Amino acid sequence: DEANGEIPLDDGVISRDGWAVLDDSAANVIVEAYEVNGKPNPLGAWVMPRDHAETDFYFFGYGRRYTEAVQDFYKLAGPTPLLPRFALGNWWSRYYRYTQDEYLQLMDRFKREGIPFTTSVIDMDWHRVDDVDPKYGSGWTGYSWDKQLFPDHEAFLRDLHERGLKATLNVHPRDGVRAFEDDYEAVAKRVGIDPATEEAVEFDLTNPDFVSAYFDMHHRMEAEGVDFWWLDWQQGGVTRQPGLDPLWVLNHLHYLDSGRYETSSERNVNENCECEKCAEPGARDEHEMHVEQSERNVSCTERNNRWPLTFSRYAGPGSHRYPVGFSGDTIVTWESLQFQPYFTATASNIGYGWWSHDIGGHMCGYRNEHLEARWYQLGTFSPINRLHSSNSQFMGKEPWNFSAEVRDSMVGSLRLRHMMLPYLYTMNYRAAFEGMPLVEPMYWADPNNPQAYEVPDEFRFGTELLVAPIVSDNDDSAQLGSTEAWLPQGEWYDFFDGRRYVSAGESGRRLEVWRAIDRMPVFAKAGGIVPLQQLGEGNKVNDLGNPESLQVLVFPGANGSFTLKEDDGSVASAASGS
């Protein structure tokens, strides 16, 4: 949080020296456990401290075979999961006290302006904050909707879905469940507290009773329309269990829970299912019966298997298993923008490929229209494109609040991101099933070329593209932005206008690239193929289905091929990887 420019980064599993060591000695371990501390554990697994002290090192001695090292790390720690298609579109997020009507009106204006969004992020003001009695503490943690802002939250969530938007809510879970919460009585009874005492239910991830009640509370809100959760953990790394990082276990448990089979208590049994279990009298009221049949019957399974997704902070090596990652509150400065490309690409060295940054910057800093336009451009070519800002009236990211030139650039960036969904979804498959992150440092493909290490702002974006974002203000005299780019040996083409660049020598070619505010340096390789979808109109501007037609950009100079990945949007279809 509040980083303004470069900060130190942890080590990955590669190095220029050819070896790296990952120390896992202090980590807890996941064990099969149906009983914890004498209490039933419905999860069937638990995170436990090691039963004896030991040194647990992993040595990666791959020379400069960087890709192979990271792919083997995935084999050791688990793969990067496949993301749902909507997560690759544009996200709208702002720390702001929207009312229910204001938020929906904003989403409607985006559609009228032809600006596609697929995900709505509602920051912490969805729940009670300012009207919490001080005797309970602050309103930073909350699980009860603010009825003044959202008088009918179920209708609000339903209206978002009707507009083609998924919804995520921001939560700060550290303060537990207190007596003013809607779910307090039920949660208190589950953990053995008399609700009449108004004793706070402590946030305790080492207590199976609390964990079960905690997730049931979330399930109720998911049944009302919440699609996934933004776990905004900021309260340190201490739990009752030695060595157990609460952020890590939160990510682990939330991600597993997000992919559970929904039960009849959360969603009605499939009325169209013709299996024997669903046809039995009383089946729609039997929780256990529905769970049993949903595990073996295709028609029910397809309906009830949720697509796992969470949105949280990085908790160390292995966090790639719990996408998407929130990189923290950023300061609105050129220094912050300059650091993000390097930060994103370098994270791939520990296998962490799905970062979500505060695109445009969150707070403080200064207002600079060129900064915002360049940040939008980087967002288009980032793993996740989530616009975000504080509640300051000067920090809003709506394109119509900027000059015409910058507004057009912003809108173009957001439209291009949505058009790139076929390409992005294919790279999503590549990340999940081939162990190749969407964003890669330049030295992965050219490990023995010194030039590849001299362009920290530059990165490969999937199999076909190379991106060298502009991260400094326009030159006053030229009124253009510039960056120093490096093109590996071969032919390259400007992604936007097709201009050809030849990099003849083995060391590649360094060049200063100048672009107007509506363009950024993006290069396609010779023989590159990039599939784009056409933007819909009106209510279909943010359509997420497989496109009926494609615009395919083909760049000459070499043979090429591209295998487009599509599925029907179900977990069962995506899990096959075919």
Residue ranges and their predicted role:
Residues 522-578:
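Accessory, solvent-exposed terminal regions and/or long lumenal/extracellular loops of proteins
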Residues 1-520, 524-525, 568-570, 576:
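Catalytic-domain carbohydrate-binding cleft regions of carbohydrate-active enzymes
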